[in-house]
Design a protein with these regions (language model features):
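Conserved AdoMet/S-adenosylmethionine-binding subsite of the radical SAM
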Residues: 143-152, 157-315, 319-322
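Conserved alpha-helical substructure of the radical SAM core
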Residues: 122-152
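Canonical Radical SAM [4Fe-4S] cluster-binding loop centered on the CxxxCxxC motif
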Residues: 97-134
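A short loop-to-beta-strand scaffold at the N-terminal edge of the catalytic core in hydrolase folds
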Residues: 90-95
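Auxiliary Fe-S-binding modules of radical SAM enzymes
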Residues: 1-89, 243-251, 257-345
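Short linear Ser/Thr-Pro motifs
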Residues: 73, 107-108, 121, 191, ...
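Glutamine-centric residue-chemistry signal
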Residues: 29, 109, 135-138, 309
Length: 345
């Protein structure tokens, strides 16, 4: 069986190349062909002997993603790609252009098992995990089209990153590699629904990445409705895990809180959220819910959003309201889904 070498780091390439009788330095050349020069046909890797090129063709393959479609927001600050994997599965990835640089939102799974009622990505459940190479390839798809640098990565696309732990961690190290994308760990954010054991595990890795927790409620009663997986993890245990993460990494945790009219956006909800978090250093990101096709949930009026934020600010909680980006191309939070399927069925 041929080995897919896309997504292998230098050490893995060295093990493969040297183990098959070729000099170690050839692995570095192979890495550069893949990740720097973007040459994906072995016959074009002319630094190698014919013998090595023949061996690569016989024993290796490079599984690239195929770009099916792309969409761009009216302000040209958000671009979404629909990508096809080798097995025919579809994933979406989004690039957001900010004043400080380009940020990419990547998917970590095909579908999602978390069941959040406001999220389009979970409607058909989880199909499978993505490999580190498939996550990395989402970034290179943008580089191939636009040749743009990336300042930061958010793992906030389809899927729960912490239930694909090993591949996600491998991807993070690849993205950080100075010879690949050279993205600082501090500019990488993992968003999780709150898989408590994995938050502790991630904290113990001692990697200074940012952790964002999709809290969305001030108590278990509301959260169990919005985020069904939370029935396995009490909200106070999620916050305790976040506190451990902060103490271990010295990285402030972000709590994401989707605001939904008549559900979790009242004055009492804001006060209860403050009591839940206590004195823990954190950032609270308020996200007015985006309109979706499959469920009738609506954002509060702006005055209600501002009132909610003001309560948090008066309690000393650093709080912002997320800027909406890409809504008209279905690229905003909670709307990453495979619309392409609707057009071909």
């Amino acid at each position: 069986m041929k080995r897919n070498i896309w997504g292998l780091n230098l050490q893995e390439l060295e093990t493969w190349v040297v183990g098959n009788g070729f000099p170690r330095f050839r692995a570095k050349q192979l890495r550069d062909y893949l990740y720097k020069r973007h040459i994906f046909h072995f016959d074009e890797m002319t630094q190698f002997s014919q013998k090595m090129r023949d061996w690569l063709k016989e024993n290796g393959q490079i599984d690239k993603l195929v770009i099916i479609s792309r969409a761009q927001s009216d302000d040209e600050k958000t671009i979404k790609l629909l990508l096809k994997l080798k097995d025919g599965s579809l994933v979406e990835t989004v690039c957001m252009c900010h004043h400080y640089g380009n940020s990419i939102c990547v998917s970590t799974q095909v579908g999602c098992a978390m069941g959040c009622i406001f999220c389009a990505s979970t409607r058909k459940g989880l199909e499978r995990n993505l490999t580190a190479g498939e996550i990395l390839a989402q970034m290179y798809a943008f580089k191939e089209l636009y040749d743009i640098p990336f300042h930061s990565i958010v793992l906030m696309g389809a899927g729960e990153p912490l239930t694909n732990y090993e591949e996600v961690l491998h991807f993070i190290h690849l993205a950080n590699d100075p010879e690949l994308l050279n993205i600082s760990y501090r500019n990488i954010t993992i968003s999780t629904c709150g898989i408590v054991p994995q938050i502790y595990r991630l904290a113990d890795e001692n990697i200074p990445i940012t952790l964002a927790i999709s809290l969305h409620a001030p108590n278990d009663r509301i959260r169990n409705v919005l985020v069904p997986i939370s029935k396995n993890f009490r909200i106070k245990d999620v916050v305790s895990a976040a506190e451990y993460y902060f103490k271990k990494t010295k990285r402030r945790v972000t709590f994401e809180y989707i605001l939904i009219k008549d559900m979790n956006a009242s004055v009492e909800n804001a006060k209860e959220l403050c009591r839940l978090i206590g004195k823990m250093p954190c950032h609270i990101n308020l996200i007015p819910i985006n309109g979706t096709e499959h469920i009738k949930l609506y954002p509060p009026e702006w005055k209600e959003i501002k009132r909610f934020q003001d309560i948090l600010l008066k309690k000393g909680k650093e709080t912002t309201v997320r800027k909406q980006m890409g809504d008209e191309i279905q690229a905003a939070c909670g709307q990453l889904k495979r619309r392409y399927l609707n057009s071909v069925t």
